[in-house]
């Protein structure tokens, strides 16, 4: 006997709830929802959709799939609003979670496609790692978009999932692949509901790490991850993310270091130095580089400083510099030259250096 919809919402029936925020996603939804139907997970599953003021045919597509999914044993909860403007991804995810019942949460973006094994394999990992965010490897569509970023997502070691959390790439397992227990989400969450321009995934990820959460990646490609200019990611300003990253670096790493060197005497390294608090700036003993012209100059003078005399920071060759380093050189861009230079120093990532590129 099928329970009426309101009873389904109350009863804790699902083991896994798939959390799907939707805003004007008509061109992707059929493929996305078909991938929910095709999951090979044998436990109970629920799809929780929150329609964030879509003005296209998204709602009709969701209603059509509700019938197909429920016929195959996947319960569907649909929430939403039709205000003139959307309330944002953070709000939509929080609403979809609040109306769902599953003990585990599997996050899905409406423009992505899950492989049939995704829920099963991530559920198995989540049971083993109850205080972790579980991610997975991805396949990019189109395949040649963001090649460096995709390699980074797929190839980080298990240690780097925790040491490379300060880079401009953001969370070391990407939000559309997240899977975790409801209990852990409740301990960390909810998502920031600031709306467009707020990196709600990054803020949640940082809070997760502050609370001692782990990061685990299932090393199978379980998601087709689409790249297109309408994606919500593009609405977040780079400077907003930069500010959050600097703050997190100053909170998590710099208190443990008496002094440090910034690796890159160019634009990015100087920008980081200028963004630091005065207390952190005083810990910077040098910049280092391989550029002979920068090294010949001898020092960087912080012209905007209110201090007198203005701070002058030496610029050294990287082999003459002292760790620990905050590295502001982009990875995977110099044909391996930078990586070889770093390797030649025999340092330990996380202890002797962190990447901030």
Swiss-Prot record:
<dbReference type="GO" id="GO:0005737">
    <property type="term" value="C:cytoplasm"/>
</dbReference>
<dbReference type="InterPro" id="IPR001173">
    <property type="entry name" value="Glyco_trans_2-like"/>
</dbReference>
<protein>
    <recommendedName>
        <fullName>Queuosine-tRNA galactosyltransferase</fullName>
        <ecNumber>2.4.1.-</ecNumber>
    </recommendedName>
</protein>
<keyword id="KW-0808">Transferase</keyword>
<dbReference type="GO" id="GO:0006400">
    <property type="term" value="P:tRNA modification"/>
</dbReference>
<comment type="similarity">
    <text>Belongs to the glycosyltransferase 2 family.</text>
</comment>
<dbReference type="Pfam" id="PF00535">
    <property type="entry name" value="Glycos_transf_2"/>
</dbReference>
<dbReference type="InterPro" id="IPR029044">
    <property type="entry name" value="Nucleotide-diphossugar_trans"/>
</dbReference>
<comment type="function">
    <text>Glycosyltransferase that specifically catalyzes galactosylation of cytoplasmic tRNA(Tyr) modified with queuosine at position 34 (queuosine(34)). Galactosylates the cyclopentene hydroxyl group of queuosine(34) in tRNA(Tyr) to form galactosyl-queuosine(34). Mannosylation of queuosine(34) in tRNA(Tyr) is required to slow-down elongation at cognate codons UAC and suppress stop codon readthrough, thereby regulating protein translation.</text>
</comment>
<dbReference type="GO" id="GO:0141125">
    <property type="term" value="F:tRNA-queuosine(34) galactosyltransferase activity"/>
</dbReference>
<keyword id="KW-0963">Cytoplasm</keyword>
<keyword id="KW-0328">Glycosyltransferase</keyword>
<dbReference type="GO" id="GO:0006417">
    <property type="term" value="P:regulation of translation"/>
</dbReference>
